[in-house]
Amino acid sequence: MTHPLVYEINTRCWLRDLSIRHGRCLTLDTVPETEFSEWQRRGFTHLWLMGVWTTGPRARELAQCDPALIAAYDALLPGWRAPDIGGSPYSIAAYTVPDALGGEAGLQSFRQRLHAHGFRLLLDFVPNHLGVDHPWTREQPDRFVQSPGPAAAAFRVTTPAGDRWLAHGKDPYFAPWTDTAQLDYRRAETRAALTALLQTIAARCDGVRCDMAMLLLQEVFARTWAEFPCPDAASPGEFWAEAIPAVKKQHPDFLFLAEAYWGRERQLQLLGFDYTYDKQLYDELLRGHGAGVQEHLLQSAPEYVASSAHFLENHDELRVAGALALAPHRAAALTVLGLPGLRLLHEGQLTGARYHAPVQLTRRPAEPPVPEVVALYDQLLAALARGGVGRGPAQLIAPRAAWPANPTHRHFILVLWPGAPDTFTLVTANLAPHPGQCYAPLPVADLARRNWILRDLLSEEWHHRTGPELQTRGLYLDLPAYGAQIFHAEPDD
């Protein structure tokens, strides 16, 4: 059992940065070997190429005239020019790789090189909508949610059957995405077409991150689009319950990751998703609410945590280096990386990048690495790998109070990773801005029959403990504010 360590890359900006750094135009089929070596050193299992698909001219035009986006470009890239704006990679005109990124052949070559280095490739699947430039808007308008006439959330397209008004994609709590066209999952033909499209994507990668996956749930979709009725009877059942098995029948190891919110995560897991976003964990960590983190993790079913995607950053969120000081950043990073499930790291996170670039940009400002953040992730990733974290089953542990009237144990996160016979690793973090103490119970087979050496993989610290003591009381922990330790235990024979 492995727990994926995924690295998200902004493909368009990354290739542009690489080209500048190496003094020549680089595409997916000419990525330098040094990139693969660095990913191996970090221990990644999957690369997520965010934004690899084709956007159209209308999407780029809309991205260049939106006032809110223009303000963001001005703040981040003063003096930006039209070529710096590629349009939203989630306004997809075609699920093909543009020549500027290396084309389909470049993607195939890149995937082969990833496999040769032991990595797997994730790509985007945006099931809720397509870009306004997609040919289906003209050729297959019945696949989209439609309005009988002009509407604020719709746009006009000319089709062989005359003009139609198609709804823009949206989620029910925000304004429509005006560069998109909303697919209609009440229609059986739409579902079949999207399943077939997903099959073509699955033939070119090893997994997909499904954008806003909960919007397709029948209850959510019916509520969102009640004012745009479908003339046909709604198809029964959930789309994901049909599409995921269809893909896995052809590609059994294919990975499905859902961007999901609103408490819909477990429902999507039960419909077949391997992993779903854990936004509640992210929110509690960024809020600095250690007790809330512990409560969320311990009250969640173990299978839910192990089927969740844990992160401190992604392309939608602010940079963690700008949100947390170094000490809480380190404790939060260890929490995310030490949990069972999928662990997601974002390009720039490991070097302390602070600028959050809108996804419409194909260029971003250069940021020198922050040595302290680089060292933080170098140390954590190396120590976790040495301790076997990310391999095999893991167990969240409820800490016990160190003594009466000491509530500081409520801020501790404890994760036990059994290793080879007679070894285990305990990941510990104190998510409080003050020192804390607790006892860590250790549900380890034959614990009391051995004496143990516990070495902290983040320092030179080590301890001898007797098995009966650990069995009876647990491991005593006394950590400073935002302290963290990774104890690897072996028998002391």
Q: What positions do the PLM features span?
A:
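Active-site and adjacent substrate-binding regions of carbohydrate-active enzymes
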Residues: M1-D493
